[in-house]
């Protein structure tokens, strides 16, 4: 079998139809590479050739590189990998310079290697489909476009214009591609697509790439051009400020682009291959491919969903509480076409919650991303009410009131009598054990936790929490609903704080411990950023609010005392108590916390924090390791204790729910990639120096002895 069908028509035009065997999408796998080798030799041997057309037999044009292959590439494979990449690119370059017109007939999405094939053609025609996406997203997986994407995008767009598409992996549709000059024409269907490709070849028999024409200049100039040189002088520093040195891919892309712009095309392609090999054989790309590709795909395929239970769809959803979380859940549900009953204690409160959806939808309309009619249609799906009777017939009701067990019990009992037969009652709680909340329900088998993250419209993750008696059917329905509204579910078992809130708390606590130890707050925040966290722990604590943290600690302490246990006091408790009760600094919402929030200026760390500051010789690496290890070790404890049931959910949940450094591939993958044996030793060092919270869990010790990764 061949991944490329070779057909020569009566006009001596060769049509290459891309058709990977046994796959729904075309990829640059071994079969494709062998097939490209074969067709390139065949094309070179043609005595009568008028042109070449690349087209696809799949629903899309081409999906990109084979990530299953890429994740296996090790440093010892570097030479073979480099040669393989160079050979593939050599074939595309040969076809590009055959001396006949080459056309890409794009019937759908072309990403990564697929877009690189298209770029190696002289003319690109796409079907006018708003769903089609083009671009080079490799950077989001710790890689760079290694099939000529950097070289050709820079030569077609110029360095500055190409950078956002290369270093941020921005994807774009047909209209944007046309405005950039990357798509030259459109067609309405596959037949017109082929007809236009043939017609263009006949009309342009002497075609070649613009950058292969003698005297061609890169748009905007090359790195020696004064205006470009001025930008490039500060670009690396700006990039470093953004990546904090955690992500080698954007740096490699910038280097390959700038170096490649100063040499001929073939040398530039070789430079690109070297940087690509460096990234592909490195650890960070493996971390990111493992989680952002394989992990997310496993979750999409229902990895933690009970098997053999029919797929389910919610048809009417009730949301109790129209505050920030309830309003966000109502919006996320309605925008997917599901009717929502948004209930609060008064119609006025419920309408305020609905107004949140109006605000978000109005913004979409003003940006041209939605019609006014569509906005009105979505808003009509949200019924704001104070009457529990309006919940009649809901097959899912989500309680989203304040974190208070008595209040949650009250609204649950009021609402669940209106559930449809076999309906599901859910609680959006971030800390309260679901089994305890389920006691208020008439059927704890149909009760489950759905922990959304704020702001709901932007946060992709939903943590599904199984109570002690939650049935498999209820879990399957919850999983299906989360996917129905386009979000990513992870599944955990019940415990205080579950997984995400519990581990997230360790990050914030570690930041405040460092402050209590006397470390300058700016050093703490910078260490977190250098670790790869999106925001520093003190800034995050302000967002959460110190009063909420104090309240949760108080509730936890009471609950543990009722169980005959104690929550030991720590230096963090003193920091929080002082800020709230002595200094009246309660967080961002109150206008003052660890940071000051001037009305007309940027937030900045409050100078009064120097009351905790003393000489502290802690190294930056120790701070970075404390921040990463404290979360990773507690994640491992969650897995060991059965709170988490899968490493995939641990890694995906830690990144999308906690903000754990994405370069690591997640909290457990951080330990794997660190080296299990080394991770155990480092944890022991940190425990000896900073406290027992760094003591390696038994599972880490066991895996270190067995020389196995945690899987």
Predicted regions and their residues:
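N-terminal glycine-rich phosphate-binding loop for ADP-containing cofactors
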Residues: 7-9, 19, 72-77, 82-87, ...
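Conserved CoA-thioester-binding segment of acyl-CoA-metabolizing enzymes
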Residues: 1-55, 79, 84, 90-93
């Amino acid at each position: 079998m061949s991944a490329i069908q070779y057909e020569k028509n009566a006009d001596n035009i060769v049509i290459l139809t891309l058709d990977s065997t046994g796959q729904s999408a075309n990829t640059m796998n071994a079969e494709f590479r062998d097939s490209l080798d074969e067709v390139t030799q065949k094309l070179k041997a043609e005595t009568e050739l008028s042109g070449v057309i690349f087209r696809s037999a799949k629903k899309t044009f081409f999906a990109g590189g084979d990530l299953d292959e890429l994740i296996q590439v090790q440093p010892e494979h570097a030479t073979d990998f480099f040669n393989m990449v160079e050979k593939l690119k050599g074939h595309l370059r040969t076809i590009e310079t055959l001396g006949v017109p080459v056309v890409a007939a794009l019937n759908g999405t072309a990403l990564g290697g697929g877009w690189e094939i298209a770029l190696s053609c002289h003319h690109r025609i796409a079907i006018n489909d708003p769903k089609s996406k083009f671009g080079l997203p490799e950077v989001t997986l710790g890689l760079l476009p290694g099939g000529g994407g950097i070289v050709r995008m820079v030569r077609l767009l110029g360095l500055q214009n190409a950078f956002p598409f290369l270093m941020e992996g921005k994807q774009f549709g047909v209209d944007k591609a046309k405005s950039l000059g990357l798509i030259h024409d459109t067609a309405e269907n596959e037949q017109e697509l082929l007809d236009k490709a043939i017609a263009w070849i006949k009309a342009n028999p002497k075609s070649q790439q613009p950058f292969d024409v003698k005297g061609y200049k890169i748009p905007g100039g090359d790195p020696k051009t004064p205006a470009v040189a001025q930008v490039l002088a500060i670009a690396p520093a700006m990039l470093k400020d953004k990546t904090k040195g955690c992500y080698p891919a954007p740096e490699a892309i910038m280097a390959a682009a700038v170096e490649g712009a100063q040499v001929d095309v073939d040398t530039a392609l070789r430079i690109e291959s070297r940087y690509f090999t460096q990234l592909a054989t490195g650890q960070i790309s493996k971390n990111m491919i493992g989680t952002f590709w394989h992990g997310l795909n496993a979750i999409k395929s229902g990895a933690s969903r009970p098997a053999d239970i029919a797929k389910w769809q919610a048809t009417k959803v009730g949301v109790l509480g129209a505050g920030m979380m309830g309003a966000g859940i109502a919006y996320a549900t309605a925008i997917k076409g599901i009717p929502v009953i948004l209930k609060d204690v008064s119609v006025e409160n419920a309408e305020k919650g609905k107004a949140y959806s109006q605000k978000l939808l109005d913004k979409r309309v003003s940006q041209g991303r939605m019609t006014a009619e569509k906005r009105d249609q979505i808003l009509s799906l949200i019924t704001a009410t104070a009457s529990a009777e309006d919940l009649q017939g809901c097959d899912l009701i989500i309680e989203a009131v304040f974190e208070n067990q008595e209040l949650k019990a009250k609204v649950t009992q009021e609402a669940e009598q209106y559930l449809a037969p076999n309906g599901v009652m859910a609680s959006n709680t971030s800390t309260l054990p679901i089994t305890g909340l389920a006691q208020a329900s008439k059927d704890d088998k149909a009760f489950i936790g759905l922990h959304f993250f704020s702001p709901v419209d932007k946060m992709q993750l939903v943590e599904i929490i199984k109570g002690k008696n939650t049935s498999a059917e209820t879990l399957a329905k919850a999983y299906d609903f989360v996917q129905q509204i386009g979000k990513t579910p992870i599944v955990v078992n019940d415990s205080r704080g579950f997984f995400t809130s519990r581990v997230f708390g360790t990050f914030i606590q570690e930041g405040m411990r460092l402050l209590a130890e006397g470390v300058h707050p700016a050093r703490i925040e910078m260490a977190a950023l250098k670790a790869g966290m999106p925001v520093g722990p003190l800034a995050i604590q302000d967002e959460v609010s110190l009063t909420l943290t104090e309240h949760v600690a108080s509730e936890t302490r009471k609950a543990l005392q009722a169980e005959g246990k104690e929550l030991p006091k720590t230096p963090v408790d003193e920091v929080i108590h002082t800020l709230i009760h002595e200094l009246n600094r309660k967080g961002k919402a109150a206008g003052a916390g660890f940071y000051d929030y001037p009305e007309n200026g940027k937030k900045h760390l409050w100078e009064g924090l120097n009351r905790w500051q003393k000489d502290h010789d802690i190294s930056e690496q120790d701070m970075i390791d404390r921040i990463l290890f404290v979360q990773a070790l507690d994640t491992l404890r969650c897995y060991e204790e059965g709170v988490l049931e899968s490493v995939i959910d641990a890694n995906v949940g830690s990144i999308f729910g906690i903000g754990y450094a994405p370069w690591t591939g997640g909290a457990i993958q951080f330990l794997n990639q660190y080296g299990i044996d080394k991770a155990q030793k480092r944890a022991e060092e940190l425990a000896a120096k900073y406290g027992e919270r760094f003591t390696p869990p038994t599972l880490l010790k066991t895996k270190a002895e067995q020389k196995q990764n945690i899987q």
